[in-house]
């Protein structure tokens, strides 16, 4: 049996962790094995890379940053994601290659096509079965982040124009692949968002079971 790969994407402060937890609870109640993971930081090596790319103070050259994310992705897919999918689990992942295209491609103003190709190479071509894009106005997301008072994060601390480029890049990716993406207004009540995600996930899993 082949598992199901679901990723959650969007800018910082959109509620990915909340929705991942809600979806996990529902899937486990339905009897599925669920593996919850993230990029960067979904493996022991990834935790070390996460500290560098997100929490290290000081400049990191944009191309170096992109390569660090790709290194994390290559190791994570090979050691965590593919083994879980091979045994039939549902993998719920906070961020994947679409984040690299949005943050390093648009945010850092690198070539988005090159970033995507690098990411696909690192992931051995693995694409999600479903990508949930939680979309939220940048100003509203900023309010949530400020209220959360989390530790220093290099990406969260970027200026508003950076985050707006990231948001528009995500929307562009979703528009280019509507069959893979579910775009949800992250300003909606969290239970409404969770219901929309469950509906799409349920249809995806049912289709896989009947294939």
Curated annotation (Swiss-Prot):
UniProt binding sites for ATP: 10-17
Give the reaction(s) catalysed. dTMP + ATP = dTDP + ADP
Q: Does the keyword Lyase apply?
A: no
GO BP of this protein: dTDP biosynthetic process; dTTP biosynthetic process; dUDP biosynthetic process
Choose one Gene Ontology CC annotation of this protein and give it: cytosol
- For this UniProt record, give its keywords in alphabetical order, as a comma-separated list: ATP-binding, Kinase, Nucleotide biosynthesis, Nucleotide-binding, Transferase
Please list the GO terms describing molecular function: ATP binding; dTMP kinase activity
What's the EC number here? Answer: 2.7.4.9
Q: Which domain of life is it from?
A: Bacteria
Against Pfam families, the record matches this protein to: Thymidylate_kin
Question: What family does this belong to?
Answer: Belongs to the thymidylate kinase family.
Biological role stated in the UniProt entry:
Phosphorylation of dTMP to form dTDP in both de novo and salvage pathways of dTTP synthesis.
Report the NCBIfam families cross-referenced here.
DTMP_kinase
Q: What is this protein called?
A: Thymidylate kinase
Q: Which organism is it from?
A: Clavibacter michiganensis subsp. michiganensis (strain NCPPB 382)
Q: Which gene encodes it?
A: tmk
């Amino acid at each position: 049996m082949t598992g199901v790969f679901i990723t959650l994407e969007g800018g910082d402060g959109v509620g990915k962790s909340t929705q991942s937890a809600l979806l996990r609870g529902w899937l486990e109640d339905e009897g599925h094995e669920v593996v919850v993971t993230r990029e960067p930081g979904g493996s022991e090596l990834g935790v070390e890379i996460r500290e560098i790319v997100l929490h290290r103070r000081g400049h990191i050259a944009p191309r170096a940053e992109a390569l660090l994310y790709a290194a994390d992705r290559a190791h994570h897919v090979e050691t965590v994601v593919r083994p879980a999918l091979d045994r039939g689990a549902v993998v719920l992942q906070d961020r994947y290659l679409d984040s690299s295209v949005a943050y390093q491609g648009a945010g850092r103003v690198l070539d988005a096509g090159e970033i995507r190709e690098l990411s696909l190479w690192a992931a051995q071509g693995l694409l999600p079965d479903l990508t949930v894009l939680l979309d939220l106005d940048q100003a509203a997301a900023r309010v949530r982040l400020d209220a959360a008072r989390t530790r220093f994060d290099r990406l969260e601390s970027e200026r508003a124009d950076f985050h707006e480029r990231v948001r528009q890049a995500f929307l562009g990716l979703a528009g280019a692949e509507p069959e893979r993406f579910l775009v949800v207004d992250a300003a909606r009540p969290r239970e409404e968002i969770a219901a929309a995600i469950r509906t799409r996930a349920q249809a995806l899993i049912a289709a896989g079971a009947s294939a």
